[in-house]
Amino acid sequence: MKRLWLFLLAIACSSCAKDHEKPLADLSFISVERKADLSLYIIRYESNINLLDLYGRGMGEGIASAQFICALDGDYDFSVEHEIGRSAYGRIQADAAQANQPTSIFFTEAFLSETLDKGQSRRDLSVEELNALLANKKTIPCKALITAYGYKPYYSNSMQLPVADLLREINKPTAP
């Protein structure tokens, strides 16, 4: 009985989530580079909206999560309830050097990985897997996803990340 009440309370509270009433951000690709010899890629992009201050409370205040996600394999369902099978993903971070500008510059240190066990774990994709996966693509779609307590999820418009730039970094030789 207690579980039923908790379930009903969760449903009631989730239906009360406010619409953020914010326009969808337009993201523009700037660059991508591999971080040292790690399987981590720094993706830089510009937004016409400050993604980390959507609610006017200050940078990062009131936000539960700020994620940047790119679909690597044609799965374009970016919804919170869905795990994209193969993706580039990471936390949205502000470029401190660009503070107080009319547009905002952000970066994400992204892992290129595959989701396993219904979202319970992830595995980094190998260089060979990434080359095969991206071989016939010109761009891949990416979105910012912001969640905040009491609000519906916020999604940006799609940004197209050039695959040629990503493959250049994936295939960079590593230091001996």
Could you tell me what each predicted segment is?
Residues 1-4:
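Positively charged n-region of N-terminal signal peptides that target proteins for export
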Residues 7-8:
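Sec-dependent N-terminal signal peptides
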Residues 12-15:
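C-terminal motif of bacterial Sec signal peptides marking the signal peptidase cleavage site
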Residues 17-139, 143-176:
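Non-catalytic macromolecular-recognition regions in eukaryotic signaling proteins
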